[in-house]
From Swiss-Prot:
Its main location: cytoplasm. The lineage of its organism: Bacteria, Pseudomonadati, Pseudomonadota, Gammaproteobacteria, Vibrionales. Belongs to the nucleoid occlusion factor SlmA family. It comes from the Bacteria. Required for nucleoid occlusion (NO) phenomenon, which prevents Z-ring formation and cell division over the nucleoid. Acts as a DNA-associated cell division inhibitor that binds simultaneously chromosomal DNA and FtsZ, and disrupts the assembly of FtsZ polymers. SlmA-DNA-binding sequences (SBS) are dispersed on non-Ter regions of the chromosome, preventing FtsZ polymerization at these regions. This is Nucleoid occlusion factor SlmA. GO terms for biological process: cell division; negative regulation of division septum assembly. The gene is slmA. Residues 31-50 bind DNA. Residues 7-68 form the HTH tetR-type domain. PROSITE patterns: HTH_TETR_1, HTH_TETR_2. The keyword Cell division applies. GO terms for molecular function: DNA-binding transcription factor activity; transcription cis-regulatory region binding.
Length: 196
């Protein structure tokens, strides 16, 4: 029973941190004092559940990694058409960000500017893994469908992910006014026509 309560409190702390990142406070540095006040506990109580604020951010980063990576792997296992795979992976990231605005501040690095470098490195690694997966999907098209792309797969993967990252940055910059999925269908039609 005590272990369950501790898990619930940990989740409560992470949810409070995500909510703070989603609010106007998210554009400023979040201190443990502010977070403790949000949760309704002392700072000491926060540290009973997490040894540092960096570990709290790591908890949110793990959630982001697990959520996105698991779903990408499912898409790649279930879908075989290259263009559908690409569309679904890109749309997944955009929808995840739109549904989790506070976590989008972490994904763009805005919430990590005043935190430990290793946190930003971890987010960078997540996006590098996604880019690698996109590049692999693009390369597999020759094997699966017998045709390639007019542009090098590495360049194309970087451009695809860059478009997504730009949409996430715009979402954060606009204080969550401009949804990342806004106009995605038009963007995808344009891209599909170019890539054929």
């Amino acid at each position: 029973m005590a272990g369950n309560k501790k898990t619930n409190r940990r989740e409560e702390i992470l949810q409070a941190l995500a909510q703070m990142l989603e609010s106007t406070q998210g554009s400023q540095r979040i201190t443990t004092a502010k977070l403790a006040a949000q949760v309704g506990v002392s700072e000491a109580a926060l540290y009973r559940h997490f040894p540092s604020k960096a570990r709290m951010f790591e908890g949110l980063i793990e959630f982001i990694e697990d959520s996105i990576s698991t779903r990408i792997n499912r898409i790649l296992d279930d879908e075989k058409d290259t263009m559908n795979r690409l569309r679904m992976v890109l749309q997944l990231i955009l929808v995840f960000a739109e549904r989790n605005p506070g976590l989008t501040r972490i994904m763009t690095g805005h919430a990590l500017m005043f935190e430990q470098d290793r946190l930003q490195s971890r987010i960078n690694q997540l996006f590098e893994r996604i880019e690698t997966q996109l590049r692999q999907v693009l390369r597999e098209r020759k094997l699966r469908e017998g045709k390639g792309f007019p542009v090098d797969e590495s360049v194309l993967a970087a451009q695809l992910l860059g478009q997504v990252e730009g949409s996430l940055n715009r979402y954060v910059r606009s204080n969550f006014k401009y949804k990342p999925t806004e106009n995605f269908d038009h963007y995808w039609q344009l891209l599909s026509a170019q890539l054929g």
